[in-house]
């Protein structure tokens, strides 16, 4: 089912107020996109099946290509019992300089019994002067599976720009059976000493986090950590992997979004068979 929600954006406002809701369900051996509702520029074009009917891949599109001050985006997905959804994006997300208004993006995922979700977006670039808030919440059933990442770039390093003005706030929570297994909250201004402190970003411009959670994780943690620790970012950046009771956490801190993305993709090729029960198949959109 595909429908367009009524537009409620005020005519005098140039900002985007966009929503996208996706619903996935199991139909025999096939995962189907049963709901695809959108308002504003957020949307997916169609369901893709690059590795057979069991996994439904969707590419989340934001046509204006960036988020400006006053924009508010909401992305939600429900992955129904026994289904397998993979969400990715065609390019980097961009948070533009703001004239004063805050922009926000809220992502909310619900993963049902025996279901699997992969959230594999490309990097997010925060322009100097942006005022942005990103919130992500993932609610897992007792036996569902999740692997996802976020890569945050402060400033446009290739253009010689650093994040020196503005504000960025981040919230991330993953729940298993209504109990949190990971909570992360942070916020900083462009002039925050934490960005250059050895105890903080240490002058780096790119930070990434990968999370992987699945029911068998406690029994496989040792072997998977050993395999993952043999892989390091190509640029030699600071990185680490941690095994918590219900989730694996991988961290990147450096200056290359490409190195972070490639490292996470290599970790994903190791983790996906254990987490999702399937070999890694690189999304074709990553190569375009």
Curated annotation (Swiss-Prot):
Keywords: Chaperone, Cytoplasm, Nickel insertion. Disulfide bonds: none annotated. It is found in: Cytoplasm. InterPro entries: UreD. GO terms for cellular component: cytoplasm. The keyword Cell membrane does not apply. Pfam families: UreD. GO terms for molecular function: nickel cation binding. Its main location: cytoplasm. Required for maturation of urease via the functional incorporation of the urease nickel metallocenter. UreD, UreF and UreG form a complex that acts as a GTP-hydrolysis-dependent molecular chaperone, activating the urease apoprotein by helping to assemble the nickel containing metallocenter of UreC. The UreE protein probably delivers the nickel. PANTHER family: UREASE ACCESSORY PROTEIN D. This is Urease accessory protein UreD. It comes from Dechloromonas aromatica (strain RCB).
